[in-house]
Each structure stands twice: as structure tokens, then as C-alpha cells.
Swiss-Prot record:
The lineage of its organism: Eukaryota, Metazoa, Ecdysozoa, Arthropoda, Hexapoda. GO terms for biological process: visual perception. Signal peptide: none annotated. It comes from the Eukaryota. Residues 102-118, 139-191, 623-635, 642-659 have a biased composition (Low complexity). CDD domains: NOPS_NONA_like, RRM1_p54nrb_like, RRM2_p54nrb_like. The keyword RNA-binding applies. This is Protein no-on-transient A. InterPro entries: NOPS, Nucleotide-bd_a/b_plait_sf, RBD_domain_sf, RRM_dom. Residues 61-80, 195-223, 234-246, 603-622 have a biased composition (Gly residues).
Length: 697
């Protein structure tokens, strides 16, 4: 598939490092190639497949079968088999076998797969506008066709051998059964384990191609892998599912079950069956015509039976000289049987009989409550019914059996198969209906004298004596009595067996009722145990939910308690902060009041000096109040704290006029330690003269 990529232009480009060229390496063989063989160095250089490019850009082989297509490739001449071959698109006959072989598989089939499938690169490429390498490769291959004649001859011989093998495989697949076809395909493809096709019989959709027919299409024969999972490995003969067979039986069973479900339910009221007219060309009108010559034709048979009615289908077996044919109505069949049976034709006595009717079934083991309508409705699921009736005695009593006549033999066969494989119940009783073929003798003519062979010795011996009564105590009477006793014994045993069967049926009915009661009781017990277990489970779930709710409630209470505690502590802290702020506000108000008092004292300080020259003493007296306040160690003002100026009223005679010009607040100028005990108040202040800005609250 890489011929569009790997061209013979080694002189223009440097090839990739390859394995050393092997001696006597044959070129790649393209089986069934219709065009000239193109030489390809990429496939014959001895290099491994993984070293080369896996897929080319556009190389779909539409004509020749590649390495993997094999003997059956391409559907045997034109039908496209979608088997998903990405490396070798093409078949032997140009049908496009798309086997799912991506290259690298070693197809070791009988004839065609002698090369080890190193991803065939000699396929003829399609003409593509954007694929320039294909055109150059075609021009180059035209010059190299002379050097490839030996490979061409060998490929053609192998193609012929492959075509012969394919034709032989197809003929065998059509002539033999499924097992033989599969064995043949396996014998031709015993070493084929790759994912593609190949082999004489099919080769991944070869031979018949496309999932059926011929040499095992749809992945049959060669073991190809079809993309359709339902058609994988359809062997040899038929190519669908398992070679010749299909899943129609399984599908019919499914439809029967669907129809049965549609009528399952109470059957208390069933509509009456309309009496239909006689079906034309039914199974009851089928005649057997024997002892014919092998030169008879269908036209002669139609002319023979034409006076008695219309003739339907005719089946002739000239090797055994008999024929089956259908007359339109039963009365016409009877009319044709009487005169034609025993008639002479070309020196032979023609035998005309009613053919065995395989569409009539006998249904037994029925309960007394099964009517014609229920029997008809129950067996109608298998196919159209011509007649269904319950057998009764001369008094109209139910005999426990009936007959069902189908319109088709296939419906009767399906009914017989399913009723024998499974238990088919018509009512609530567990008595399954028993179905068996019923041979109906519609021949009312019996055995006429002309039908006997009078040339036999036994005939002459038996007919030598006529009818008679035996004398008492004679030889004939003795052995005649023994025959009667033998038949009486048979009848008595038959009656005893019937009575025993009746007793066993009644016993089985009683056991069935008891078993049904026990089974229903066991079902009730199981239901009770189930409900008890459900009750226990629900109780455990309820307790678990209650426990979870209790735990959640406790967690919520703990959370609320913790939240309340936090709120209380927060409120206590807020109250303490508020109380502290109130105290600070009170102290601040007191400080403001004191400041206002100090401001007032500063504004009216001259009046406190005692007036005039004698103000020294008066000032001292006036200052004594503040001295006591300042000496208080509990004062919040630093300016008054520790002021021990207590003897200002003593020797306070300054220089005269200078001392009187100062106000009486000289004691507040004002260190913490004013140790002026008796000296000049305005003169030497022993403390720190701190300004008013030193006040601290």
C-alpha cells in the first residue's frame, strides 16, 4: 500500500537505514494481478515491515486481489464484501474485498499466500489528483516492466490455481452440508490465523462474499472477521450465521412467546368460532399417485385429473415412479380417486390414495374444561388453523383429547417440537397437553377385489375354503376359542391398564393440589420472612434515625449552651467595660471641674493676696486650702501630689512690693516637691517649676 510513497528514486534521496539485503530475495507476489507487475524496492529490500511506513496517502486497489484477499477475495467477481481491510483493498475478481488485515500477518494458505505479507506495495493505485507520487511511480514502473516478467508469470500461475481452488470450494460448499463445508474450509485454511481473509473456500468474505452464499461469505470458510457480530464465521454452505442455517428457529420461538403473552389471562368468555368454508388446496386434498412410468409429465397428470377439478401443485419423483398432487376440494379428490385408482396406463395399474396429512395433530391429556374455542385460540399462536375440535362420545362427554388441523406443515412441525420440548398448559391445571401426529384415514373405499394380487400362493390357499361356523368340540373350534381368549386377555389387560392409569392420574392430581398448596404456603412464608426482615430493617433504621436525631439534639443543646455562655461572658465584659468607662467619665468630669476651678483661681488670683502690703500673710492664708489639697496623696493630679508646702503662713516676708505683685498661686508653680518651708514664696522654689502642661489624668 506504500507504492505511492516509496518510489524508485534512490538516486535522488538517501534511503533510511535498512537491514542488509538478503540473497535471492523474491519480489512481492501480487496474487490475481490483472495489470503489469510493478517492482517495488520497499517491499523486496529485505527490511522488516515495521521499518517502513504503515499506510500510504491514497492507494486503494480496485482490481487485483492482494496478499490477504486470497482465493476468495472480493466476493468472487464483483460483490463488495465490507470486511474492513485497510492494507489490501481488492479481491480476485475486482470486487473490493476489504479484509481487516492491516499488514504484517503471515497468511500461510495453500496456494496464494506464499509471501509473508510484508504489506503489499505492488497494488495498482487509484488516480488521485493530489497524489503526485502515484503518477511518478506509474511512469517509473512502465520502464521496469521488462525486468519483472518472471514474477508476472509466477503470479498468473498462482492466480489460476487460486481461481481453480475457489471454484472447487464453492462447488463443494453448495453440494455438501454445513459440517462438510466447514471441514473443507478448515482444511484449506488450517494455518490461517490472521485477521484477514484467504483460503480456497472463503477467505474473509470470499467465494460468495458479503455475509452469505457461495464459499462461505460473511467471514465464513477462511475465518475472516466480519464487522457484523451476528454474521461471524458463517461456515461454508450458507454463509449466514452457521453455514446454511440461520436463527429463524430462535426468532420463531420469540414470536410464539410474544403471541402467547398476548392471550395469557382469564379465558372465561371466549367468542365462538365462525365456521369457515373449506380451504382450497388444503392438506386433506392431497393425493398420492403411484405405479407410474418414468416418462410421465406434469401436463399428462393435469389432463388425467382435469375432469374432476382444478389441480394445484405437483411433486413428482420419476425415479420411484410416484407423484403427489393437490386437488382444489376434498369432494373432488374423492371423485378423482374412485375411478382412477386401479386404472390402466401403459400396462400398469395406477394407484391413487389420499396422501398422509402431516398438518393434523392429536392433542390429549386435556381437562374437561377445554372447549373448541380455547383449543383453537391456544394453538393459533403457531400458525393459521383450519379446524380445531374436542373429541366427545355419543353422549357429548369430554374424552380428554382433540384434533388440531393446521393450514401449513411448518406450523404443525413447530407446534409438535415446542410441545414436546416444553410443557404447554391450557388452563390453571398443571396437566400439560400431549401432542402427536394424527393419521386420518379418509379412504372410505377400503380394499376392493381388484386391488388384490391373485397370483400369490397364499391367496389361493386362503381362498380355497369359504365362510363357515365351526362345530363344537372340533379342532377348528378349539383354536378359534384360543384366539378369542388371547384377545379377551389383551382387552382385560388394556382395561386394567386404563383403570391403573386413571388411578395414577387421580393420585397425581391430589399430589399436585397438595404440592400447589405447599408451594403457595411456602411463598407466603417467604413473603412473611421477607416482610419480617423488612420490618427489622425498618426498625433498625428507625432506631438509627432516632439515635442520630438524639445525637443531633445533644449537639445542638451543647452548641446553644456554649453560645449562651459566650454571650453571658461577652455581656459581663461589656458591663465591666461600661462601668470602667463610667468611672473614667466621672473622673474626667471631676478633672474638668478641677480645671475650671483652677482656671477660676488663675483668673481671680489677685484677690487672694490679702491686699496691699500686708498681702503676704493673707496670701499665705489663702493658699492654705490648696496646700491641703495638694498634699493629699490621693489626688489624681500630679501637680498637687506630694506638695509639702504647709508652712506658707510662717515667714513669708519677701522683699516687699515685688512679693506682693505675684499672685497667691506661687505654691503651684509647681513641682512635685516644693520644699519651701518658710522662705520666700516667690523667690526660691526648691521643687521643679513644671508648667501646667504636666497635668496628668
Amino acid at each position: 500500500m506504500e507504492n505511492s510513497v516509496k518510489m524508485d528514486n534512490s538516486g535522488n534521496s538517501t534511503p533510511l537505514p535498512q537491514r542488509q539485503r538478503r540473497a535471492n530475495n523474491q519480489p512481492n507476489k501480487n496474487i490475481g494481478k490483472l495489470g503489469p507487475q510493478k517492482q517495488n524496492e520497499g517491499a523486496s529490500d529485505g527490511g522488516p515491515a515495521e521499518k517502513r511506513q504503515r499506510f500510504g496517502p491514497n492507494n486503494q486497489n480496485g482490481g487485483g486481489g492482494s496478499v490477504v484477499g486470497g482465493g476468495g477475495g472480493g466476493g468472487g467477481g464483483g460483490g463488495q464484501n465490507q470486511n474492513k481491510n485497510f492494507a489490501n483493498k481488492g479481491g480476485f475478481g475486482g470486487g473490493g474485498n476489504r479484509n481487516r488485515n492491516r499488514g504484517g500477518n503471515q497468511n500461510r494458505s495453500n496456494f496464494q499466500n506464499q509471501n509473508q505479507n510484508q504489506k503489499s506495495t505492488t497494488d495498482a493505485p487509484k488516480a488521485d489528483g493530489g497524489n503526485l507520487n502515484d503518477k511518478s511511480n506509474e511512469a517509473n514502473n512502465a520502464n521496469q516492466s521488462n525486468s519483472n516478467s518472471a514474477a508476472q508469470a509466477q503470479a498468473q500461475l498462482q492466480a489460476q490455481a487460486q481461481a481453480h481452488a475457489q471454484a472447487q470450494a464453492q462447488a463443494q460448499a453448495q453440494a455438501h452440508a454445513q459440517a462438510q463445508a466447514q471441514a473443507h474450509a478448515h482444511a484449506q485454511n488450517q494455518a490461517f490465523r490472521a485477521r484477514g481473509g484467504g483460503g480456497g473456500g472463503g477467505g474473509g468474505g470470499g467465494g460468495g462474499g458479503g455475509g452469505g452464499g457461495g464459499g462461505g461469505g460473511g467471514g465464513g470458510g477462511g475465518g475472516g472477521r466480519d464487522r457484523n457480530p451476528d454474521r461471524r464465521g458463517g461456515g461454508g454452505g450458507g454463509g449466514q450465521n452457521s453455514g446454511g442455517g440461520n436463527n429463524s428457529q430462535r426468532g420463531d420461538d420469540f414470536f410464539y412467546s410474544q403471541r402467547l403473552r398476548s392471550i395469557s389471562g382469564p379465558t372465561h368468555e371466549l367468542p365462538p368460532i365462525e365456521v369457515a368454508q373449506e380451504t382450497k388446496f388444503s392438506g386433506r386434498n392431497r393425493l398420492y399417485v403411484g405405479n407410474l412410468t418414468n416418462d410421465i409429465t406434469d401436463e399428462e397428470l393435469r389432463e388425467m385429473f382435469k375432469p374432476y377439478g382444478e389441480i394445484g401443485e405437483i411433486f413428482s419423483n420419476l425415479e420411484k415412479n410416484f407423484t403427489f398432487l393437490k386437488v382444489d376440494y376434498h369432494i373432488n379428490a374423492e371423485k378423482a380417486k374412485r375411478p382412477l385408482d386401479g386404472s390402466m396406463r401403459k400396462g400398469r395399474h395406477v394407484r391413487v390414495r389420499f396422501a398422509p396429512n402431516a398438518t393434523i395433530l392429536r392433542v390429549s391429556n386435556l381437562t374437561p374444561f377445554v372447549s373448541n374455542e380455547l383449543l383453537y385460540k391456544s394453538f393459533e399462536i403457531f400458525g393459521p388453523i383450519e379446524r380445531a375440535s374436542i373429541t366427545v362420545d355419543d353422549r357429548g362427554k369430554h374424552l380428554g383429547e382433540g384434533t388440531v388441523e393446521f393450514a401449513k406443515k411448518s406450523s404443525a412441525s413447530a407446534c409438535l417440537r415446542l410441545c414436546n420440548e416444553k410443557c404447554f398448559f391450557l388452563t390453571a391445571s398443571l396437566r400439560p397437553c400431549l401432542v402427536e401426529p394424527m393419521e386420518v384415514n379418509d379412504d372410505n373405499d377400503g380394499l376392493p377385489e381388484k386391488a388384490l394380487n391373485k397370483k400369490l400362493q397364499e391367496f389361493n390357499q386362503e381362498r380355497s375354503v369359504g365362510p363357515r361356523f365351526a362345530d363344537l368340540n372340533s379342532f377348528e373350534h378349539e383354536y378359534g376359542s384360543r384366539w378369542k381368549q388371547l384377545h379377551d386377555l389383551f382387552k382385560s389387560k388394556q382395561d386394567a391398564l386404563k383403570r391403573e392409569l386413571k388411578m395414577e392420574e387421580e393420585k397425581l392430581d391430589a399430589q399436585m393440589e397438595y404440592a400447589r398448596y405447599e408451594q403457595e404456603t411456602e411463598l407466603l412464608r417467604q413473603e412473611l420472612r421477607k416482610r419480617e426482615s423488612d420490618n427489622e430493617r425498618k426498625k433498625l433504621e428507625w432506631e438509627m434515625r432516632e439515635k442520630q436525631a438524639e445525637e443531633m439534639r445533644k449537639r445542638e443543646e451543647e452548641t446553644m449552651r456554649r453560645h449562651q455562655t459566650e454571650m453571658q461572658s461577652r455581656m459581663v465584659r461589656q458591663e465591666e467595660d461600661m462601668r470602667r468607662r463610667q468611672q473614667e467619665n466621672t473622673l474626667f468630669m471631676q478633672a474638668q471641674q478641677l480645671n475650671s476651678l483652677l482656671d477660676q483661681q488663675e483668673g481671680f488670683g489677685g484677690g487672694n493676696g490679702g491686699g496691699g502690703g500686708g498681702g503676704g500673710g493673707g496670701g499665705g492664708v489663702g493658699n492654705s486650702n490648696f496646700d491641703n489639697f495638694g498634699g493629699n496623696s490621693n489626688s489624681p493630679f500630679e501637680v498637687f501630689r506630694g506638695n509639702n508646702n504647709s508652712s506658707m503662713a510662717g515667714n513669708n516676708a519677701g522683699p516687699g512690693a515685688n512679693n506682693q505683685q505675684q499672685d497667691s498661686f506661687a505654691a503651684f508653680e509647681f513641682g512635685v516637691n516644693n520644699m519651701n518651708q518658710g522662705g520666700n514664696q516667690r523667690g526660691n522654689n526648691g521643687g521643679n517649676n513644671v508648667p501646667w502642661g504636666r497635668r496628668r489624668f
